[in-house]
């Protein structure tokens, strides 16, 4: 099983500490988000220098606030330090963030993704970008030696987003998406689109909250509180509705070790290629159990 760990440290030193801990435990990858704290690409550049083996990823960096050329420069700089271990996860974020907090327009998100990738992907592959879109333009190359191409995952959940991702990036990174939805929607949609475009089979990286515990009811109550907001964001709400569940706590993998193990196995059986655990409670027991699966 390809299992990684996600955390959201508030200092660069803690990011290094977490990455070392997870790497020493045998986990294959370490993932951080870009929300309202550290600049994740900067933090992971330090992590890449200090922790030499574990693969690194962002889950995810919002696209709208950064021109694709600037994001490409950051990602390839990180990749130069990481020596090929870095995966760039990007996402559109949400209307309430992009419009309400940044004052930018969130209209036509599928167009935005297509135009963004049209500039970003050549630059990440060491090529020049030469593109004019309706809202984004890019005519430049980057001079960053000793930086291998950067695999790019998109937080694509809807059908149109999955189709664009399959044709232009290396895969999708999901959140709040259970095994039923991965098996019936995410995997078949992105795999079909990639095959039709003559692209390699895409990566499907599934992230979910995880807690190994003897008190499932209490752990689910904690999950319901900690992850409440995701049930109100339209893109995640659509996936929860597809799954046939009420809220985020219902897709969390919670229970004793055998129950959580079975839940992870179901994720892979549904078509995911990688699983990223988000331990949120009873972390020591959860990490110990997850390490036992490696």
Give each language-model segment a name.
Residues 1-294:
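Active-site-adjacent structural elements that line small-molecule/cofactor binding pockets in enzymes
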């Amino acid at each position: 099983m390809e299992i990684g760990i996600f955390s959201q440290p508030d200092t660069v030193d803690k990011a290094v500490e977490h990455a070392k801990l997870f790497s020493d435990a045998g986990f294959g990858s370490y993932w951080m988000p870009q929300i309202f704290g550290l600049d994740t690409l900067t933090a992971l550049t330090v992590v890449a220098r200090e922790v030499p083996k574990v693969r690194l990823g962002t889950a995810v960096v919002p696209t709208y606030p950064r021109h694709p050329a600037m994001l490409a420069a950051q990602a390839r700089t990180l990749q130069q330090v990481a020596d090929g271990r870095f995966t760039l996860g990007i996402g559109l974020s949400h209307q309430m963030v992009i419009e309400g907090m940044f004052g930018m327009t969130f209209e036509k998100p599928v167009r935005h993704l297509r135009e963004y990738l049209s500039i970003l992907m050549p630059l990440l592959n060491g090529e020049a970008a030469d593109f004019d879109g309706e809202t984004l333009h890019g005519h430049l190359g980057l001079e960053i030696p000793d930086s291998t191409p950067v695999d790019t995952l998109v937080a694509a959940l809807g059908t149109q987003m999955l189709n664009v991702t399959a044709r232009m990036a290396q895969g999708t990174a999901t959140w709040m998406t259970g095994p039923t939805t991965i098996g019936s929607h995410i995997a078949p949609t992105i795999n079909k689109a990639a095959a039709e475009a003559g692209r390699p089979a895409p990566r499907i990286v599934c992230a979910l909250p995880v807690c190994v515990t003897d008190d499932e009811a209490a752990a689910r109550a904690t999950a319901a509180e900690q992850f409440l907001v995701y049930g109100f964001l339209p893109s995640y709400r659509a996936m929860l509705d597809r799954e046939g569940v009420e809220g985020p706590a219902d897709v969390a993998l919670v229970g004793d070790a055998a129950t959580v193990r079975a839940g992870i196995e179901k994720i892979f059986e549904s078509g995911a290629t990688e699983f990223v655990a988000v331990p949120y409670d009873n972390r020591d027991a959860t990490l110990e159990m997850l390490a036992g699966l490696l």
